[in-house]
Amino acid sequence: MAAIKKTHYVEKYNYGSGVVDLGEYIISFAVSCNLGCEYCYLRYSKAPKKPVLYNLLKGNFSEEIEILFSSSSGMEKNFYFNAGETTDSLLTMVHFEELYKMIEIIREKAKKYNVKCFIELRTKTENIFKIGKIPISDESTKVIYTATLAPQNVIEKFEKDNRIAPLQRRIDGLRYALSCGLLVGIRLEPIIFYPITGLSYKEILNSTQILLTNYKALLHSCKDVLDSENFHSLAFSTLRLTKEQYRILKDKGSELCFPEMFLCPDGKYRYSRPIRVTIYKELINYIKSTSPQLINKTLLSFEFDYIWEACKLKVKKLTNLL
């Protein structure tokens, strides 16, 4: 049974101190996710252990959207909503039923106030194949189906729940979404330094090359998706951990706690700057060589402007891709 939310459904995303703002609003139509990915911040937060789904129709969601659009006063005409931050968008079919209601509410208000909206549904599941009625896009409201992708060895190591789709099925889901007329996006978030072959300088270089080989192979395997005219955006982000996550994972000897991780200005642990820049630059250069048109649709998530600059990537917002 869906609950009534006591706080806001819609909030501007707080990226953290110094992190580039991509212009998203987060829609908390549900909270928590029991897929159990080892790196997910929800496992280490105060989120309920059992996922909670909110009743949008009985709550204040419609009023919040109305206020947001009406108060923009022409200054903000493009809105990007992320419905996959506080839970997996397609965790269950009941989740999707609430999402469908949410999309229709936003569509109605967008037409009323003459604004354009993108709504991102983000998932690691293959539940899109179970959906009977796919939401349609129109001029005012476009739905983006995004899949979080990782090499299969990373999935098997850190995403062990049997409800999580293997890599190939996630890519198949993207193709299916395209066939249904949806826009699609790919999120390589988080890029995880795995396997670690050793801690000497030479061994870290070797591990980096293995990582890059695996992620380039992943991108190659979905090149048809990347080259689709309905492809919206590609985002890269290496692993980041809260202080509490890092402490817990380090205490239990998790392979997520790579020794070359440092506390950043936003209070999150990340790989060292040289490692992050190397990974991003190599993947960006790969995209430039295989699908150069995608550079204008490529972003770094949860990164600082000096990292974008070091990678020679122009800072952009998701709303600029409308």
Region locations from a protein language model:
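Auxiliary Fe-S-binding modules of radical SAM enzymes
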Residues: 216-322
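Conserved radical SAM core fold
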Residues: 86-91, 125-130, 143-164, 190-198, ...
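Well-ordered, non-membrane alpha-helical segments in soluble/globular domains
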Residues: 57-67, 96-105, 163-173, 204-222, ...
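Conserved Radical SAM active-site core
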Residues: 2-25, 41-146
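Short cysteine clusters
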Residues: 33-40
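Conserved C-terminal portion of the radical SAM core fold
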Residues: 169-245, 300
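A short acidic (Asp/Glu
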Residues: 92-95, 130-135, 157-160, 194-213, ...
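Hydrophobic faces of well-ordered beta-strands that scaffold small-molecule active sites
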Residues: 79-83, 119-121, 145-147, 184-188, ...
